[in-house]
Amino acid sequence: NLVARNQDDHVKNIAFLMDRTGQWSLSPAFDITWSFNPAGDWTSTHQMSVNGKRDQFTRADLLAAGRSAQLKRGRAEAIAEEVIAAVRDWPRYAAEAGVPEDRYGEIQASHRLDLLQLQHPEPQS
């Protein structure tokens, strides 16, 4: 949601499934679509927060969310890298789906592909 700008992310878009033995699991993803409008009531910022923020996310926010979810060391960053790689392919997906070029350009311009970059690079020795 952060990288591809689905800012209409709210708790009704997250679900769990229970199997016959009573075990819960996260449901397959649904209602995932680009929704960003800086002037919109519901789409100017994210509806759910990450690390207490609804915008201006950083690499540190993603890693903090991973720690909060008790992901193993490095897993949050690996997941973010996978997502960024998929979103980077947006032009190809858009072309395959027949999205008009001006529209896919608008969507692509809003993607956050730099979330894993260090905000303050460490000095070189």
Task: Give, region by region, the residue ranges found by the protein language model.
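Anionic ligand-binding catalytic core segments
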Residues: N1-S125
